[in-house]
């Protein structure tokens, strides 16, 4: 991966985290403190939306499939570090969210990061396997 890609993915990851944190600072109470069905709907759809957004970013940046795991980490790390600060200072960064909702919010975050990173790892492993199979076919032939 090019140095420019590394830097741009870190910057994009930071921007996505800032936008998401601002959104949840104002709207998290509507998701986490209203109805169970609203929470579970958001719990199911937000990770999928995040994964789609990240896939679009990697495709538009033309990141080779074999580099998706590291590229996705570059997108995720700013948010993971930022969320550690947010979760440890929940009342400061999420003033509309009750402290008791910190656990569900944390679970929500972990699920999103897990789905996005697992998807990237699967894509990377398949790409590497495909390259190895092609190389073995050429050497056998």
What is the meaning of each model-derived region?
Residues 19, 40-58, 80-83, 111-115:
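Core segments of alpha-helical transmembrane spans in multipass integral membrane proteins
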Residues 111-131:
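Membrane-water interface at the C-terminal end of transmembrane alpha helices
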Residues 1-33:
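N-terminal signal-anchor transmembrane alpha-helix
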Residues 31-52, 68-73:
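Loop-to-helix transition at the N-terminal end of transmembrane alpha-helices
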Residues 60-77:
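Loop-to-transmembrane helix junctions at the membrane interface
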Residues 33-41, 96-106:
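Non-cytosolic membrane-interface motifs at loop->transmembrane helix junctions
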